[in-house]
Amino acid sequence: VWAVFIAMAAVLLIERAGVQYSAGQHKLGMLAANDAVPASSALFGQKPTCLVITDTDQAGVEDVKEQFDQILLDMKIAHRDVDLSLDGADAIPSLTSYDRVILLMPSLDGLGTHLSDIMSWVSAGGSLMFAMPPDNSSYLQVIAPKLGIESAGYDYVTAESIVPGEDFMIGGGQRYELSDPFDSSLSVSLRESAHVWAKTGDAGTPLVWSNECGSGRTVVCNIGIYDMVMRGFYAAAISLLGDATAYPVINGAVFYLDDFPSPVPSGDGTYIKRDYGLSIADFYAKVWW
């Protein structure tokens, strides 16, 4: 029996003796920090393809505008701003040179007849986004079918969580709790033509939906919360305004250090001193962190 094993080992040794292993040399090219182009520089001189219409006289709009300025900068979308409170509705330019319009205002009354012009532009192939839950006014009721709205109430409901669709964004299909929720979302019932991309986890209130309107498209964000952590949801909603959106994928990892940084207690801990032979400060720096 031993002779058989020895013979097999000898055969394997002879068979593998001619096999040479070598490791390939891989080098990852890194872009020098001073060669990286800031987003603001990359957008400089670019022709705006997005028109953002705001009315900073309305409550909360100025803060929302600040968030969307950052979102559009991060997405490198060149845009032009028109503030109804400063410029007036007549400052809204011809929409023929734009492929998307974002309305940053709950009340549509200030648009006047320009709202009809915008909706005609959408029907001809433009894309329109309502970034804030719209007030239920006569203006909204006129255009509601084009937004995919069957009926809208005058009350607002609590958005305690958000459940994005799996085809809406990475991480879709899961429920995400919203901190400090309040009655922020307009109570609406949608038409069958509307495509709901995100909803609340409890009552299923539509939070983000789109609707085909003629040759164009409308997108409504009914979230009503604009904390920094919500930027990803609004960026995903902006991506619905086009047929395709490019975004970077970073091959990286994040490590979270518990309680870092924090004040370090002085002195020695009984068990830390016994088990590690270190002071509390040294244990924090050399072991825990």
PLM features: residue spans?
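Helical hinge/lid and interdomain linker segments adjacent to catalytic or ligand-binding clefts
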Residues: 58-138
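Ser/Thr/Pro/Gly-rich low-complexity linker/stalk segments immediately outside membranes or between
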Residues: 17-40
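Active-site beta->alpha N-cap acidic-glycine motif
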Residues: 226-233, 240-289
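Catalytic beta-strand/loop cores that center a nucleophilic Ser/Cys/Thr
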Residues: 159-217, 222-227
